[in-house]
Amino acid sequence: MITLLKKTIQPYQPKLMALALVLLAFLAPFAVVSQYQKAFPIATSVITSFAVLCLLFFVWFIESEKTSQLVKSLKSPYYWTIIALFIPASLAIVAATFNLTYILSSEYVNYYQNSLPRRVLNGVIYISIITLFILLLKRLTNTELNYIGKAYLGGIGVLVLFGVWQFLHLSIGYPMPDLHTRSAVHSVQSEVLINFRLTSLTEEPSFLVPFLIDGLIIGLMLYKNKRSYLWQWMLPVLFVLFFSFSISGYANVLLVGLFALWLIITSKTINLKKLIKPVLVSLIPIGLVIWWKWSLVHELFMPIIGRFDVLFDVTNHSRLYMLVYPFIWLFDYSWINTLFGFGPGSYDFLAQTKFLAYGSKLSATSNNVFVDLLFEHGLIGGGAFLIAFILFFIHLYKRRNEDAYYQYAVILWFHLGITSLYRSDFVSPRFWVIVMITVLCAELGKRSLQAKRNSIEHESLEPRKVGGK
């Protein structure tokens, strides 16, 4: 019976896998939309991710060469980051169990009974998805792999559409449902030209901008006609990104742009003179407009400039406070906590026991992947993940000039590192979809190189005409 089922399903394996991954990629941007997440008693993203996991596991189960595939895949550098997260997380769970006998706190017991199981469940789901994705990756065609990126762009496109709609609503009163987002400008004392920030369907700009920048990079890769990319995709995305007035988003674009420029400068295939000339021609009029209308530009950017006064004040800026003080709290209680952490999701314990200078409670995250993992998994776990993350970046960077897909892969990984500094979403669909698309780019680059080698070998083996040179 099982053998018959395998024979029946095997021809459809790639289609089923592609369907599951396309669903995950399309729905990933909505995981930061509260209305979407609260549609069911259990978070919607958890339900959809679990459904995707079940479908991928079913596809893998009917695979005929599971053991040999597993052995080969475990040697892949793609698993560095996964292993560096999975093993320390397991040790952190053991450490959290030990802490129950050491940290005599009802808040810690509450965390252990509630937040820990949820975090472990989410982590297991996403690590399992990416593991199965890598195991089954070679069964997907290039077209099916591209569908995953296009599906992710489709989800981001919905956020862009609602962002433009929100701009019309907040600027001219065009009717729109009240989404209860943090679109108001805050922490600014001076007058502003525009007193709102675009959030689209998300709760605040910092939730939105990582998806927009994802879309800019992936869209550039997938759009064959770059003029269509400019008018149909890039300009609408940049419009929403600009009016988000997100400091982290602006900094993210700048850093990724500088890194992409560095790749271009060190590239062996791009003519720098042809690139620099149009860039300078476009920057000169922009600079002149800024100089001529400086007061207007100053008011326009006041939602950003006006927040610099408290941006680096550790005691009054909640996000900075939650970034700095975990390095101190990590050494509380015992050396077990210092080395192995307080347990997955233990920032919830901090949220119940620590307070800001003005009396408010902490958030359940530092909004930084690396700081969260340092506190939750300790010096060993946090350090292992950081090292693996950097090693995989180096692995991609060394191959950047071999194929254009490798360039997109290293840019995406660099961008993921930047967004991880201000969005702690490593147990959410977006983080793992970007990991997936990065691996996808590397696989397409590998296939492209192999196709070129095969073409060269085929030409060298062609028989020459008698008397030919």
Model-derived features: positions:
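N-terminal hydrophobic segments of proteins, predominantly signal-anchor/transmembrane helices
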Residues: 18-36, 52-128, 416-417
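Loop-to-helix entry and N-terminal half of a specific, functionally important transmembrane alpha helix
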Residues: 16-29, 232-235, 364, 368, ...
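Alpha-helical transmembrane segments of multi-pass inner-membrane proteins
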Residues: 127-132, 136, 146-181, 190-194, ...
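Transmembrane alpha-helices of multi-pass inner-membrane enzymes
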Residues: 19, 25, 29, 53-57, ...
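Hydrophobic transmembrane alpha-helices and their immediate junctions
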Residues: 79, 157, 226-229, 262-266, ...
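A conserved mid-to-late transmembrane alpha helix and its immediate loop/hinge
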Residues: 204, 246, 357-396
